């Protein structure tokens, strides 16, 4: 990929996140919207992507077949669903197009497919593209190393009523950051639900609680609770635009990488801290 203006394609262009991504592209330097894609049969196919997102005419017509638009973009941004993202991944890999993946809810096979594709193309794959959330992940690593062994750890997350996966990808990323810092596997210590007679809390576990209500953009709290005190590290998002700007920033950053699997901590250089 060259250092010239990067052409962005957005799938799910008519959705809440898709429209925010289109807006973000128009607000940031070094990028232009090259393609916009919606699902086959959508009434939005054929409309102008800029008018769809409320930013005026962009002369980019919403299409429904990514494979026919690969000459129009350098980086694909995908915040859709796992099955769709994996289809787009195969197309991008075939045509050597980079990807920014914000889709959550992948199973192990899906994650493996992303890792394999990164041998050929550059991919930024993150549960959350907010700068603040990724700073929180770094803080959680530090807190877990100091307090993790003697505190009860709980992660509470809340999202809007339309979110289809639980716990959120961000909540799982928080759990993984904590578990990794303590030398554990999240698979072995996560507790995802409690109901009925559960007995006392088992030491060394990481609990998850989920709220789905209203129009909550995203709220996440990690709690380290001891007798007499507790530490809570919280992030609250009030607009999807924070995720959109992070995703576009990642696309720009990918311009310097022909292949490899990265996350937002790489983009923000947080791994050096």
From Swiss-Prot:
- Write out the transmembrane intervals: none
- InterPro entries, per database record: DapB_C, DapB_N, DapB_N_CS, DHDPR_bac, NAD(P)-bd_dom_sf
> What are the subcellular locations of this protein?
Cytoplasm
Positions binding (S)-2,3,4,5-tetrahydrodipicolinate in this chain are 160, 169-170
Superkingdom of the organism of origin: Bacteria
Q: Keywords in UniProt for this one? A: Amino-acid biosynthesis, Cytoplasm, Diaminopimelate biosynthesis, Lysine biosynthesis, NAD, NADP, Oxidoreductase
What GO terms fall under cellular component here? Answer: cytosol
What the entry lists under Pfam families is as follows: DapB_C (PF05173), DapB_N (PF01113)
Chief place of localization: cytoplasm
Q: Give the reactions, separated by semicolons, that this protein catalyses.
A: (S)-2,3,4,5-tetrahydrodipicolinate + NAD(+) + H2O = (2S,4S)-4-hydroxy-2,3,4,5-tetrahydrodipicolinate + NADH + H(+); (S)-2,3,4,5-tetrahydrodipicolinate + NADP(+) + H2O = (2S,4S)-4-hydroxy-2,3,4,5-tetrahydrodipicolinate + NADPH + H(+)
Q: Which Gene3D superfamilies match?
A: Dihydrodipicolinate Reductase, domain 2 (3.30.360.10), NAD(P)-binding Rossmann-like Domain (3.40.50.720)
**Stored PROSITE patterns:** DAPB
The UniProt entry, under PANTHER family, shows:
4-HYDROXY-TETRAHYDRODIPICOLINATE REDUCTASE 1, CHLOROPLASTIC-RELATED (PTHR20836:SF0), DIHYDRODIPICOLINATE REDUCTASE (PTHR20836)
Protein name, please? 4-hydroxy-tetrahydrodipicolinate reductase
Organism encoding this protein:
Yersinia pestis
Tell me what gene encodes this: dapB
